Amino acid sequence: MGLPDLRWGILVGYWPLFVAGAWMTIQLTLVAISGGLLLGVLLGLVSSSVDAPRPASAWAAGAGRLLRLVARAYVGFFRGTPLFVQILLVHFALMPMLIHPDAGWLMAGDAAREFRQNHGAFFSGALALTLNAGAYISEILRAGIQSIHAGQTQAAHSIGLTHAQTMRYVVLPQALRRMVPALVNEAVTLVKDSSLVSAIGLGELALAARTVAGAYSRYWEPYLFISAIYLVITLVLSTLAKRLEMPSHLRGH
């Protein structure tokens, strides 16, 4: 078998579909990394609270242990199961509970029906990616907090700062700066993982390629094309990560 006879001209009529798919991929990534950052910070702080001074109240100590257990279970589930399964679970199991014409927890009636028809796939995909990203970002934050020398925490306590003040003014600012390259790498992962959302009918890049492949029974051209788009997006993000890893004086600041 020789090299494939590529016919790039078949993509011309589908250019708007690929543009819309690329924009949808970027939107999914932005929503997931933003929501995942908020969720990951909360989970990371809960997981790291084991190093906090022991509360005087037994009830508060018990509540803290329970929250840490829940956080560990959450992170373990979303890091230990396939993202594809998580997307299907959110779309076909969780989504009908939250938004349903009959008795949705968040939305019901005609508004729920219209929302699911127009935005259901995006909501499910963004939610699944956000929940998954939150688990990974929480571990990034926990590692960032642990990378701060314990002497800084002890010094902050010695001048009268509470644990919360120490985290806010001393630990978190440094940890968040160290997290930036890892967060960009997580964004790169989300860009590539967003292709899985095509399984629930969201019109992103993978679905655009599948549409062209189905119309012409040709696979090289559409899938090579979206591979190039994914590569451009991830190279831009990877370049950003490398730039952020450089010392500030080398970045020109």
Regions found by a protein language model. Name each.
Residues 1-253:
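Transmembrane alpha-helices and adjacent helix-loop boundaries
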